[in-house]
Amino acid sequence: MRQAARFAMLGALASAAMFATALAPAAQAAGFGVAKFEAGTCNGNETEVKSCEYTSPSSAFYTQAAGHPPWGLTGVEVAHTGTGSSRVPTGEPLKRLRVDVPPGLAADPQTLETCTREQFNKEPKGCPPGSEAGFVELEAVVKVLGVPVLAPPLTGKVYNLDQEAKLPLLFGIAVEGASPIVSAVHLILEGHVSYAKEPALEARGIPSGDFHEYFEINNIPPEVEVLGGVKSPLETLKSKLFFNGHAGNGNFLTLPSGCGAPSISTSYVEVESDSGEKGSTPTVPPVGIEGCSHVPFEPITEVIPGPATSEKTSDQPDGVITEVKVPQHEGAGEINTADIAEAHATFPEGLTLNPSAANGLEACSPAKIHFESSTPAECPGGSNIGKVKIETDLPPGSLAGNLYLGAPQGLPITGPPYTVYVVAESTYGVAVKVEGTIQPDPSTGRVTAYFTNTAAHPFNLPQLPFSSVVLELKTGPRAPLANPLGCGGAKTESNFIAYSGEGILKQFTPSFAFPTTGCPNPIPFALTQSATPANATAGAYSPYTFNLTRADGQQYLAQISTTLPAGLLGDIPSVTLCGEPQATTGTCTAASQIGVATVTAGAGTEPYPLSGPVYLTGPYDNAPYGLSIPVSVLAGPFNLGTVTTRATIKVNPNTARVTVATTNLPTIVGGVPVRLKTLKVEVNRPNFIFNPTNCGALATESTLTSTFGATQGLSSPFQVGACGALPFKPSFKTATSAKTSKLNGASLQVTLTQPAHEANMKSVFVELPKQLPSRLTTLQKACPEATFAANPVSCRPLGSEVGSATVVTPVLPGTLSGSAYLVSHGGESFPDLDIVLEGDGVKVILTGNTKITKGVTSSTFAAIPDVPVTSFVLNLPVGPHSALTAIGGLCLKPLQMPTTITAQSGAVVKQSTRISVSSCGVRILSHRVVGHKLIIKVRTLGAGLIKLKGTGLPTVSRRVSKSSTVTFKLSLTRGGLKALSKARRKHRKLKINVRVAFTPKQKGQFGSAAATTVTFKR
């Protein structure tokens, strides 16, 4: 099979430059060096080509870009003296010769048969006829009997020899003693590729490192036999070497595919004498290469899954095989394909970089590649991400190597574009070191590979054809790429730019499908979840761990909304909340940390682990609290910075259950799709999160959303134990005022307190005494359910607001406070008492279901959240829209409120709560004056001491053992009588303020007093 990259063999023609041209002196030349050097490609037959020189008409030259010229030749003449047959080379004899040919000028040794070096040295005529590559004509000077003699013209053949180690091109030149004077001469022409810089050569004006070919003859004999056996110095004078461009299969020689001025086809020759003296000169052909518009250019890129069965399966690591094929046109009359100057390949949609590849991954610095140097690459083993094989004009499979991940010198890889190095070496002395750029799409992760010439590497893609380049990525769970999630023939798109001359670009953009199998339809989205406390004791502080697991082949996770079990709460006041901008940048302090988040990312069985702290923040995205979860993406040689995920923390107003939700879960970082496999969040701050006090079956419930928009609901059981060990000793007190009226109704205050670390309340039932019924006119003003649901404040103008409440809870730094409303619900006989509490951005609604039976009002708060409450105070005041009214006096007898308080643990406290009535200790029922005597009737509630006094009246007291009505009869004292007499003289009446005080016998109760004014007339 024809190999594409041909090593320029025109330089082989320059081997003739070892033969000097003149025997006689030439007055114009002096010293060692080159007098004339010509190189080019010519038309014509074997006879016509012998006369092809720079002075020939332009029609004599072959100029078609990428074409196969009939002939390629070089002509070299060394410096000499004399003219005609008297020419003699000047300086010392030629020892070594080197010829450098233009980049892209190529020959294909594989198109010819080969001859072994052993056979050539023994008897060149024994080489296969198919190994003949051309012929030479030369002139040389020998000494016969000590006299310089220009030997008759010598001719010989050029044979293609077997390629050897470090020699990609090897030819034998056999001059078989056609002259009766000179014996046979056998020379070896060694060909190389200039892939490394040669500073010494460039100092002499000869370029290097641009992948042109150069050729050396190092075995020029210092002497030959003349006249059948006499040794004589050999001084070459002039030579022409002709390569048959149509030898072999007709395509032995190929011109560069780039067009331009003749200067781009410059060749160089360097000669060296026995003493080491050097001479060099360039040559520029009289005509340039043309016809680039006719050069075909049809490269193809194919991307196929790796060899393993799993590598053809969706969402699996894949040792993808990428092959760039360049069809060759090998016929003698055909124009070959253009060389590739730039290549872009966009991989199939969904075939993306795999985070799992970071496991054990290293990177190779440019210094370790040794660009522009013949030193082999010294990349660390961990940077090897694949293999490369290039099919060129070497034996099949001999140019091979590795694909390495690159990194800046001494620095981590901080983001796209990413660098790769293609390093291929051959035992035949050819090395290719190409830098590539990998640019993933930041939104989709779709990968595009770029191989271009750059300012740093102007010959990154040398002008050397090839028939095939195969890149085979590393296989296994750490493969650099992972397959698309879906099937359906995603396509590879490639774009190539040819070497086609100045200002001319030829582009070709083919697309080929990428086969992926094993795709269910539809693609499933069924993750698994677990959530457990470290300590399952009710009410205990315990770390809480939440896990999500996604199997390969599942849709990718984009959003999470997780509702914690009822009663699983955090002690927010114990944490310093992280503010802005620290929460956004993920730079909170340890005082805000409440846990750790760990993820594994990547396809396959070895996803890469990453972790970061979980910080509690202040308000975020309309939620009272939030989370900031910064994860430093340090993976192998990569440092892609810190990715901060934000989450909201909201509290359900009816259940007080906490919901944590994130809508910005990272799906692509640095152009790399995360392919999240597991997510683990551990809330492990000491004495922060504590368990419910309800031992019933609870659950952690999540709603997941995929990048495809699919949703999944998950529920993980959660249950604690030992609820019975929790104490439950709440204190429940109520109070009202005896100051009631028809206009403003009656008041009621409820105060509930509870020590810390007890079972939390679940429900409260109360039954009001008959003396405190619900107020009908207020019930009729109950707020409609829809209005309340839309905005409770809208209920105020309706007269539905009947009170206020305040709650202190240890889980919030401040207090919750708000209003109490009567709310009517469809189908219910009586409106509920709904209490709206707000504070620290949290809203909680407590619903009391109201019933009225035979004038007695009862209320049940049946669904109190499992939240610790330090104190709860409800005030239902008097007013035009009071919730309650009064029947009769509230001070006539004790008011009792049957009360049942049930704990989340199941414990029950039942009591008959006595309502404390203010403004009701003592009352003056009546009074009258008869002459100089006051008769006053007083009523008390309970046992105690009654004391009565007034100016001009005696102070009297009396103890009562129970609620009593006592009549006092008091006569004016002597002072009182004097005051009365004085008033009469002024024609006035005597008015005396009388005060009645009552001190209850029972300790802890407040005393009371009443007063009135009495009038004495005579």
Q: Could you describe each region identified by the protein language model?
A:
Residues G906, A983-L990:
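Short loop/turn hinge sites at secondary-structure boundaries
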Residues S15-A17, P25-G921, R1018:
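Ser/Thr/Pro/Gly-rich, low-complexity intrinsically disordered stalk/linker tracts of secreted
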Residues L97, A343, I560, V764, ...:
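Residue-level detector of buried hydrophobic side-chain packing
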Residues T973:
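Residue-level signal for threonine
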Residues M1-A29:
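Sec-dependent, cleavable N-terminal signal peptides
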Residues G976-A979:
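Short beta-strands and strand-coil junctions in structured, solvent-facing domains, enriched
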Residues S964-F968:
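Short strand-edge motifs at loop-to-beta-strand transitions and within beta-strands
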Residues C920-R958, R988-R1018:
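Extracellular glycosylation-rich, acidic/polar low-complexity regions of adhesion-
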